[in-house]
Amino acid sequence: MIDLHQLSIPRRRKTVKRTLVIFASLALVFMLAAPLFAQSYDPMKFKSSKPQSAWKIALVPKDATNAWFVRMEVGVKQFAKETGINAFQKGPAKTDAAMQAQVIEDLIAQGVDAICVVPVDPSALEPVLGEALSKGIVVIDHEGASQQNCLYDIEAFSNQGLGETIMQELAKMMGQKGTYTTMVGNVTNASHNEWADAGVAYQKAHYPNMTLLAAEPRVEIMDNLDTAYQRAKELFKKYPNLKGILGTSSLSVPGTGRAIEELGLKGKAFVTAVGLPNECAPFIKNGTVDGVLHWDPRDAGYAQLATAVAVLKGQKIANGLNLKAPGWTSMKFAAGSTKVLQGQGWITINKANVDTFGF
């Protein structure tokens, strides 16, 4: 008589075998992928054995066409000229995290020695930056304090301090009362959201007669000038009591300023943000905007490259680091961090000085 139970044993063995193969395959995948996820790297181990003349350092902005990053490239070219190092800027044609990741993939394939990056979305870049680090490529971030796969992130200032200062400027314009909202380039942009969060927290602690717009507390403009204009126009029409916009993108002021003028809301609605002098000048000069906050992207680009060079030289990074750019000459680690370095780089732009910058 045939024992049906015995006939099922080979089948069970095959099932167990398949299960073991699957688990082994998954384990291999995770082992191979390990460099792509956050690891702890010792910056001192990234000292280059090559002569400085052979180094290649790339800076990857969010968007190669954005005026902010066009200005940043001026600093990259200045650094290359002054040091003789092959430093260059290469970025996506628009603000897109996937496109930015592809640019970085291409640079890894080219065998660059260091990648400096201003991330569109830090979390989206973790895999590709992890790959770069695992191959011995120095990674330096700017405006990416939450980035895990980088050796250092350099900031022109404390993100909290800037956010609070933007709010102080907006509150002054609004007479410390009324409804406002926040505007960010991208909701995935770490720095933009930190500035906005700090501004809101400061308002709640210091300006009780100001109120954050509950229906739309954070507006995304995709770092696009036309989108900033359209969204601002929609907001002011939809919410007649809306009195102010706290912006974080450099396009917040020119976009919102245009909307304020077209809707006849000058003196009734207000905006301030970080911004470029030339882009904001018309609105500052005609009184639509009192002032904006700014740091020079040229100096930010220069400072990123200087940080990468310090690591490639095997220099120990410590408080007081001088990156040889205005506002970046005495860097200090953020409280509780061994990765985020902060300078003293912001400037308030107003009618008195808007024409003195030349960009």
Q: What is the predicted role of each segment?
A:
Residues 3-13, 37-359:
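A residue-level marker of the well-folded mature domains of exported/periplasmic proteins
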Residues 12-22:
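Positively charged n-region of N-terminal signal peptides that target proteins for export
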Residues 23-35:
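Bacterial N-terminal signal peptides
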